[in-house]
Amino acid sequence: KLYSTAGTRFKKLCIQNDLHLLDASVRHLGTDINYIVLENLYAHLKDKVDFFFDTPVNSVTVLENGYAVNCAEESFSCEKCIISVGRSGSKWMERICNELEIPTKSNRVDLGVRVELPAEVFSHLTDELYESKIVYRTQKYGDKVRTFCMNPKGAVVNENTNGIITVNGHSYEDPALQTGNTNFALLVAKHFSEPFKDSNGYGESIARLSNMLGGGVIVQRFGDLIRGRRSTPKRIEESFVTPTLNATPGDLSLVLPKRLLDGIIEMIYALDKVAPGTANDDTLLYGVEVKFYNMEVAVNEQLMSRYDGLYIIGDGS
């Protein structure tokens, strides 16, 4: 089914409450169906290309007539090379660009929390739009906070990025796998220039702090956060919202910088005006959620780098 914001009444409702609903069309597959799509892609390609799994690439060398892709046990030569390492390969991509002197510029990192609440709170939005991409500009700092990756009747999950445990969310097409909760991320984008340029390093440091304090992901009731107290196992157990992820109860104010947390709290109160119940005491906040972005690599309109035949594509570019 295709969901769209075209002609929706919620655009006006959001604007009336200082929120902005972005235009978007969504065709939902679900995590369970996504596996089938990937299996079909593999089946389509397996007789046409060679796959090498569990084969880390150490470096890429520029040759006179092409490139060498160097792995631990062997090297592959080619006339043209396409690099597509995704967000998880951000550090690797940065190192390769430095070694090959390919120009890059610093990008951003998105930091925030994953919100979990009863599915009924957002059902009027999710039933029509499925995913609401809503942006809010904070009154205090003028920062933009946005909703991201909304999962109606979904589950909150751990995500391992470069050995750091962060939080994410899934949703399913199969009703048997669905839950009574909806979850979504609230993210604040941070950009850096001079003298500090390591946006990803900044995000990693905050995520590592969460791991250090909670042994992984931390969960906190919204009511506890605004009252300046940590959540305890007893308070989580007595909450009217049953968490779908077994996270460590704690205090997110000891992890996230004040400016980011202030913006997230502002956004929750703003969302409460279009989805009453968002700012309930028992709304759960999991932290931290981080979206890493690669250094922006200098490529032309064909996604080719300064080297003829070396292309850098996807989230890795």
Residue positions per predicted region:
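Residues forming the flavin
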Residues: 1-317
